[in-house]
Amino acid sequence: MDSVSEVKGAIITIHGHTRNADDYFDKMVSVISGENLKDDVLIISPKFITLYEQSKETDWYWNTTSWKWGLQSYSSFNGNNISAFELIDSLVSKLANKDLFPQLTDILLTGHSSGAAFVHMYSSTKFDNIYNNTNIHFSVVNNQYFLHPDSTRLLSNGSLSVLENCEVYNKWPYGLDDLSPYMERIGEENSRNNFFSNKVDYFIAELDTDS
């Protein structure tokens, strides 16, 4: 790739529970290279670090699970924190900036396992697969957690029902009650509309043995 102005698409790949972002990056590079697309596609593989991986006091960090729900980071030394979703927002915003990437038309956000949960939840923050005239595609691979857009749940007898005597089942990230600070800014109704507006691709692998 000689210049970012030549980039036509971007892939943001989200790691799983073990947060091995480098492995995900390498695998995606291998796939793109095999399709002769390495000059057209930009690959980004962010890592959500923990306290013990901080290299600077200003680094934001999460515990081993909070990042996948889009929750706030722990405060850095100056008291600032940020939602994990906001970090992806900043990447998407830059990629959709035509002054920076004039030919970029499509962004794929994909995740595996815990990363799949992240992508699934994050899809409820955008409307109709579009951001600043850039197409956003969501790919959810081997997800184990799902956001429900209303308070009903599918029972073993095939019926839908609101659960009784269970106060937490519909709270974020499993439902739209008691939303995280980031999702609260979007609001319950907008989140629900976003959820139904997007096309999201779901994949399940029978031999999924890694996180």
Which role does the model predict for each range below?
Residues 12, 42-44, 110, 139, ...:
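Hydrophobic/aromatic beta-strand patches that form the interior of the parallel beta-sheet core
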Residues 17-91, 136-144:
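Active-site machinery of serine-nucleophile hydrolases
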Residues 96, 105-107, 111, 123, ...:
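Eukaryote-skewed repeat-based solenoidal scaffolds used as protein-protein interaction platforms
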Residues 131-211:
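The feature captures the conserved acid-bearing segment of alpha/beta-hydrolase catalytic domains
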